[in-house]
């Protein structure tokens, strides 16, 4: 299976994955998540990007996702994880968490090489589905990280509030 982990950071999913990230990590295969020109059209079965697209504004993300779609095989899988804005807002409005507890997931401070980047937008399921539909992605649905080929890797798709409380968190 041809699989890409885009925005993998320091997480190495193993030799059967292609690792792409803008950071400086020894296990990376490539450093530019927006340019996949090294891959042929329709060559990948799975692209996984956990907490990546929110670092691009609503205009920048369109060509980014179009490039990712180009390399996906027909019926290939694009698996995205993004901060869950409705859950974060709901927990805050219900006074179950403080403002300080949602700032990290909403604004996403990430040191990268010689700069620090922050989230530029947020999504709910409907806005993400609309965006993906505009690029002809189909069968857009939620997924459970426990039922994926990368479930053993602790990444932001498994982030819960309280932080990483997988038993009691939301």
Regions found by a protein language model. Name each.
Residues 10-41, 144-145, 153-164:
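Adenosine-cofactor binding site in Rossmann-like domains, unifying the SAM/SAH pocket
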Residues 51-55:
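Short catalytic micro-motifs in class I SAM-dependent methyltransferases
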Residues 44-45:
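Local beta-strand N-terminus motif with an aromatic residue
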Residues 58-63, 67, 71-73, 77-170:
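S-adenosyl-L-methionine-dependent methyltransferase catalytic module, highlighting the catalytic core
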């Amino acid at each position: 299976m041809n699989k890409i982990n885009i925005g993998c950071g320091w997480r190495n999913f193993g030799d059967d994955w292609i690792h792409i990230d803008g950071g400086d990590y020894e296990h990376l295969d490539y450093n530019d998540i927006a340019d996949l020109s090294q891959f042929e059209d329709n060559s990948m079965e799975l692209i996984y990007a956990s907490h990546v697209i929110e670092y691009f504004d609503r205009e920048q993300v369109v060509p980014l996702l179009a490039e990712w779609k180009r390399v996906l095989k027909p019926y290939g899988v694009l698996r995205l994880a993004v901060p869950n804005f409705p859950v974060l807002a709901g927990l805050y409005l219900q006074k179950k968490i403080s403002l300080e507890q949602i700032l990290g997931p909403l604004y996403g401070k990430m040191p990268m090489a010689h700069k620090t980047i922050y989230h530029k937008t947020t999504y709910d399921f409907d806005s993400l589905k609309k965006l993906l539909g505009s690029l002809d992605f189909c069968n857009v649905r939620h997924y459970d990280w426990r039922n994926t080929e990368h479930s053993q890797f602790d990444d932001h798709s498994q982030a819960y509030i309280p932080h990483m409380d997988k038993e009691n968190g939301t």
